[in-house]
Amino acid sequence: MATKTVKVTQTKSGIGRLPKHRATLTGLGLRRIGHTVELEDTPSVRGMINKVYYMVKVED
């Protein structure tokens, strides 16, 4: 059985944001605007996405 994944793309810069939000972007593996990563769809990843929802775009 394949695990469900979610694509996350950074749409805004982390400059000038709260340090915890910048750390969350790094934790998601995002490095720059336009960078896309594919992650497992787990509650912890969803929580990180919800924390920085205003800087990312999510595709299921």
From Swiss-Prot:
Keyword list, A-Z: Ribonucleoprotein, Ribosomal protein
Molecular function, one GO term: structural constituent of ribosome
Cited Gene3D superfamilies: Ribosomal protein L30, ferredoxin-like fold domain
Domain of life: Bacteria
Claim: Ribonucleoprotein is one of the keywords in the record: yes
GO biological process terms held by the UniProt record: translation
Name of protein: Large ribosomal subunit protein uL30
